[in-house]
Each structure stands twice: as structure tokens, then as C-alpha cells.
């Protein structure tokens, strides 16, 4: 009699009656077996991963509702889903509608002008801009860093070359997108807190609202990649048929709040008025967090890395 390689139980058939693992055979050691497993997983449209992705995209709020009600075996966990989508989001190109602020969006018009390239210009509005609410506080950081690096560069080159604000702008912009994507998870606890307050009457655990936030942010990242691919496809058309870049941004601005309404209504089993109010609170919390906290954190982290 053969024993299960996983738990040691004596096997009766091809699968262990105790733990469910398939009987181990010599061919399982070969590379072909590994490839066949990968192919099966990638093409199994009834598998948990693809089933979960379909539900996330086309049935707003269903995954959260199923989690609340304890029906979890058919779906991958909210954390696993978020991590999987995050990996795709992190490695994909950036597109308008994401959360990245480049150097010129983080600083005042004065520093923007100092960081201009030889063939670049700024509008009067851009020059007059005060930047972000915290830009006046962070401007001395940038000035000190550029000054120190300029002195070091001149000392090392005997005065033949230095370090400019434009040099720092390019270094900052090269890192900002990755930092922004890595920090997107910071929105989850804030969104969950907003939902906890909006639906306090349902007496749900904070962890349940956290799950909804994971699902919502997963959809946000996934939909952004779909819009990116749509943009790439439309760019294959003649230039006269290309939609303006702002169209993709407005598509996301419309899609995400609408999705939030349907998701809240299903997940929290509430009527349309409460769903609209809950979705408004969710989106407002994310927007306010972006304006007053997230962008500042993004700047500090990017500054520390550049």
C-alpha cells in the first residue's frame, strides 16, 4: 500500500481521503508536469481566480457580500486578490487617472521654473501655482538637496559640471510612479474607516469594511489596466480617430463612483438612497485622503529615495 506524501495516510485511490492531495507518481518530478499545471491553471475559466475576477468586474459588491455571509470557498481571498491585481498594476505603464504626482505637480511655480529644460516653457497659470498645500514647507528641502549636490558635483569635476533643479526633477519623476503604486494600499484602511462610519447601524466589524475596501481598490486598479489596453488599441487607429487623453481620465471618474454605488448596494443590502450616500462617503474619503495625506506621503517617500 502507498502512503500519502503529504500526510502519511494509506492511500485507497488516486487522491488522499484525508487531505485530498493527488497520489504522487514519478512523472510529477518532470518539468512537463509543471508546465501542464501552469497551462491548466491559466486556462481553467471555472477556477477560483478567474471566477473571482469575473465577479469583481461584472457583479459589483458580490465578493464582499459573499464574504460577509461566510460563503468563501468559491473565491480567492480578498488579500490574495488585492496582491495579485497590485502586481499587475505595479508593473504596468502609468496612465492618466492614477494617483501619481510628478515633480511639477508637487512644487510651486517658482521651483517649476527653476527645473525647466532648455526647450520647455510654463504657462502663466503654472507659474502662479502654489503647488500642493504642503509645497511651501517642502520647498526648502528641495533647495537644500540641489544646492548640496551641485556643490559636490562641482567639487568632483573641478567646476566643469554641476547639478541642477532639472536634474533633480528628472530623478524624482523616474521614481515617483513606482512609489505611488507601492503606496496605493494606504487607501484601504481609510476607505474602510469611512464605511465603518457610514454603516455604523449595521454593526459590522471593521475587518468586513476592510474587505470591501480591498475589493473596491482591486477593481480600481484592474479597471485602470483595462482602460490602458483600450487606449493602446485605439491608438492603432488613424490619428484623427484618437480620443483625447482627457477622455480616459473622465471615463475613470465616471466608472469608479458608479461602480461604488452598485457595490455598496449589493454588499450592504441597502436601498438606493443609502447606497448613493455610502458611495459618496467612500469616494469622498479617498479623494480627501489623496489631497491632504497621500500626496504628501508620496512626496516624502520619493524625496527620501532620490
Question: What role is predicted for each listed range?
Answer:
Residues 1-306:
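Membrane-proximal intrinsically disordered regions of secretory-pathway and membrane-system proteins
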Amino acid at each position: 500500500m502507498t502512503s500519502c506524501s503529504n500526510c502519511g495516510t494509506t492511500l485507497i485511490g488516486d487522491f488522499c481521503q484525508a487531505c485530498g492531495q493527488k497520489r504522487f507518481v514519478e512523472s510529477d518530478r518532470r518539468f512537463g508536469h509543471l508546465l501542464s499545471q501552469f497551462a491548466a491553471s491559466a486556462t481553467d475559466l471555472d477556477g477560483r481566480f478567474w471566477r473571482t475576477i469575473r465577479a469583481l468586474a461584472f457583479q459589483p459588491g458580490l465578493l464582499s457580500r459573499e464574504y460577509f455571509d461566510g460563503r468563501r470557498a468559491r473565491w480567492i481571498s480578498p488579500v490574495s486578490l488585492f496582491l495579485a491585481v497590485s502586481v499587475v498594476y505595479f508593473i504596468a505603464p502609468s496612465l492618466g487617472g492614477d494617483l501619481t504626482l510628478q515633480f511639477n505637480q508637487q512644487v510651486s511655480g517658482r521651483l517649476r521654473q527653476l527645473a525647466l529644460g532648455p526647450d520647455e516653457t510654463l504657462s502663466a497659470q503654472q507659474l502662479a501655482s502654489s503647488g500642493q498645500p504642503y509645497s511651501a514647507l517642502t520647498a526648502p528641502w528641495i533647495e537644500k538637496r540641489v544646492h548640496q549636490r551641485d556643490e559636490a558635483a562641482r567639487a568632483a569635476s573641478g567646476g566643469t559640471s554641476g547639478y541642477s533643479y532639472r536634474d533633480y526633477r528628472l530623478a524624482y519623476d523616474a521614481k515617483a510612479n513606482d512609489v505611488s503604486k507601492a503606496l496605493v494600499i494606504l487607501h484601504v484602511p481609510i476607505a474602510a474607516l469611512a464605511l465603518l462610519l457610514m454603516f455604523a447601524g449595521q454593526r459590522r466589524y471593521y475587518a468586513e469594511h476592510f474587505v470591501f475596501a480591498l475589493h473596491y481598490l482591486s477593481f480600481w486598479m484592474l479597471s485602470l489596466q483595462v482602460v490602458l489596453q483600450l487606449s493602446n488599441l485605439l491608438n492603432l487607429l488613424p490619428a484623427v480617430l484618437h480620443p483625447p487623453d482627457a477622455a480616459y481620465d473622465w471615463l475613470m471618474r465616471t466608472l469608479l463612483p458608479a461602480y461604488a454605488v452598485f457595490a455598496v448596494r449589493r454588499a450592504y443590502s441597502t436601498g438606493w438612497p443609502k447606497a448613493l450616500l455610502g458611495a459618496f462617503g467612500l469616494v469622498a474619503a479617498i479623494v480627501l485622503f489623496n489631497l491632504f495625506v497621500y500626496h504628501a506621503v508620496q512626496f516624502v517617500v520619493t524625496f527620501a529615495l532620490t
